[in-house]
UniProtKB/Swiss-Prot annotation:
Its cofactor is FMN. Homodimer. Belongs to the pyridoxamine 5'-phosphate oxidase family. Pathway: Cofactor metabolism; pyridoxal 5'-phosphate salvage; pyridoxal 5'-phosphate from pyridoxamine 5'-phosphate: step 1/1; Cofactor metabolism; pyridoxal 5'-phosphate salvage; pyridoxal 5'-phosphate from pyridoxine 5'-phosphate: step 1/1. Catalyzes the oxidation of either pyridoxine 5'-phosphate (PNP) or pyridoxamine 5'-phosphate (PMP) into pyridoxal 5'-phosphate (PLP). It is an enzyme of class 1 (oxidoreductase). The lineage of its organism: Bacteria, Pseudomonadati, Pseudomonadota, Gammaproteobacteria, Pasteurellales. This is Pyridoxine/pyridoxamine 5'-phosphate oxidase.
Length: 209
């Protein structure tokens, strides 16, 4: 399959180092808000990469909260990503908003949220999602879809109203050490503004495209 001629020229916006906030988390919130306002498809979706024994793997997860501490998501602790983080907490996140010709790359360290924080978020989820957290042995081989459906039925009967949070399910905070903002530009001369955390202070620089 010849894909050589599939390309796009990015012309929508540019990114000035001077106009970027000194705090990359504030800059990220600004861009995320703009993605939401532009009705970007799945603006909170992020590719998360982990590494075990030098072997990287990645998957799409949803950002559920962002603040000055970092990026928060929730998952099954016994999933592949949960085991990976337990062995190596260094992760990378990538957001891609093609409608705005923008991307954000994050490198950081993932740590578990408190049980209270995980309880609070779990309680806010739709009933079916809470049942699903119990029913799914995430990333494990499933004999058939029928087995999963039957398990959901049993759990729904067991928890008709209140569904407690499973101990194997909860949240992570990714505390960033590096954040790069990418804005597509014509002729592949893209704008790249990168922040590094150095002795608890953010250093901001422009990178070559």
């Amino acid at each position: 399959m010849d894909l050589h001629n599939i390309r796009a020229d990015y012309t929508k916006q540019q990114l000035s180092k001077k106009e970027c906030d000194a705090n990359p988390m504030k800059q990220f919130e600004r861009w995320l808000n703009e993605a939401i306002m532009a009705k970007v498809n799945e603006p909170t979706a992020m590719n998360m990469a982990t590494v075990i024994d030098g072997k990287p793997t990645s998957r799409i997860v949803l950002l559920k909260e962002v603040d000055q501490q970092g990026f928060i998501f929730f998952t099954n602790y016994q999933s592949c990503k949960g085991w990976a983080i337990a062995l190596n907490p260094y992760v990378a996140l990538t957001f891609f908003w093609p409608e705005l010709e923008r991307s954000v790359r994050v490198e950081g360290i993932a740590t578990k949220l408190s049980e209270q924080a995980s309880d609070d978020y779990f309680a806010s989820r739709p009933y079916a999602s809470r049942i699903g957290a119990w029913a799914s042995d995430q990333s494990q081989v499933l004999s058939s879809k029928r087995t999963l459906v039957a398990k959901v039925a049993l759990l729904s009967a067991k928890y008709p109203l209140f569904v407690p949070r499973p101990a194997h399910w909860g949240g992570y905070l990714v505390q960033p050490t590096k954040i790069e903002f990418w804005q597509g530009r014509p002729s592949w001369l893209h704008d790249r503004i990168c922040y590094w955390l150095v002795e608890n202070e953010w250093l901001k620089e422009r990178l070559s495209p």
